[in-house]
Amino acid sequence: MGNLGGSASDEIDAPLDEVWAVVENVLTAPEWQGGLDAMSALEHDGEGRATVVETESDIKVKRVKARVRFSYDGPTRLSWTQEQGDMKSVQGAWELEDLGAGRTRATFSLDADPGRMLGMLIRGPVEAATRAIFVNGRPGELKRRVEGSRPG
């Protein structure tokens, strides 16, 4: 197996600032992102946002741990890079685009190299299932989280 990644987008019925508020609060991600089981902040920036975080994820064949550094370029981009962990490398980002009329396009991208040993476990149907959870499903999860928290 090579890299596990790709990108996926969805349109959210909420203004950019509401979507950014959810994306920016990285420590709540396990509440709404499937397979992401735990996050704990190791460092914060001057605004109190988590910048270095330990994560634990269930990728179906193994639980993987990582230390990730976040970069905030709000309200349109949140990116992260693995500093150390079970995967060889991980980089990802949320990119938000204001569509006007109270709508936002959210694009999730991920580029992860599981490395040789873990890569041997993530093949075929397991690879497809992992990609479905960790890439393709993310924008829909964000949409449900944001739209579900809006007063109706």
List each model region and its residues:
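Hydrophobic ligand-binding cavity/cleft-lining segments
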Residues: 1-48, 152
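Short, surface-exposed coil-to-beta transition loops
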Residues: 5-7, 63-67, 88-93
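A structural signal for short, well-ordered beta-strand segments
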Residues: 8-12, 55, 94, 108-110
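Short loop/turn positions at the edges of beta-strands in beta-sheet-rich folds
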Residues: 12, 33, 72-74, 84-86, ...
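Short strand-connecting beta-turns/loops that link adjacent beta-strands
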Residues: 15, 46-47, 75, 99-103
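Glycine-rich portal/gate segments that line the openings of hydrophobic small-molecule binding cavities
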Residues: 30, 40-84, 136-152
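Beta-strand/loop substructures that line and gate deep hydrophobic ligand-binding cavities in soluble
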Residues: 81-136
